[in-house]
């Protein structure tokens, strides 16, 4: 089955060098408590509903052939056991309060969409970034064919990855990838399991593999008070020790933000991020200085 595309973002300047088109795929093996794109976690189509946009015209109830929408205590409720995710209710929703997330693309369709912005790539040194969710856990045959096609057409290809995927997936595609934007969240394995649901051993092993084959590695570290940022920078220092022997092209320190809260409401998912905070600007500079002191030169706060 073809992977589902969550979004195609044009003119991105935060997902690699130059002006880029970022393709977000649905589905991720991690379950990060602070996930900024909860609609990307599921490998299947998701339904999102924004009650603040809804005018309660109830047209969707009348038009749903599966009788999957009802009113309970004045609110519209979707009955998951009846909903076929057919999209019929979307066609009659004048306010756009209802949406289905996830579309299939033939490789030729996706490449055609990407190539619309070729002139921007050429003039800015940009290209395409494949992101997610987790792109490295998508159908390998599809992914391999996509990156080969883009590479053969002279388009710079970046992979934004959490690193939690079979090593053979990286072995298959790395020759046609220009750079990897590689997330490192935590060094401590128990903490990694606590906050993401998975061990970080596979992630760190894949990172070492990419280094061994000479891949261009760009590290991205989300900085979150209460997760990997503390008074003594213990976790950051452990991350530095992991990265020290590797050939790292750049490091992006990404301050936590909570602008995604509305997405959880639209997905009817529990929002668990109230405990997290963005580090102060002083702390961010302190962490940046730590990396500089350890001979990492290309350090940036932000995307």
What would you call each of these model-derived segments?
Residues 2-17, 223-303:
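Auxiliary Fe-S-binding modules of radical SAM enzymes
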Residues 5-59, 76-85:
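N-terminal pre-triad scaffold of radical SAM enzymes
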Residues 33-40, 59-78, 88-103:
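Iron-sulfur cluster-binding cysteine motifs and their immediate structural context
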Residues 40, 99, 193-199, 268-276:
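Short glycine-enriched, charge-decorated loop/helix-capping segments at active-site entrances
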Residues 82, 103-109:
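FAD-binding FR-type
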Residues 108-260, 265:
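Conserved AdoMet/S-adenosylmethionine-binding subsite of the radical SAM
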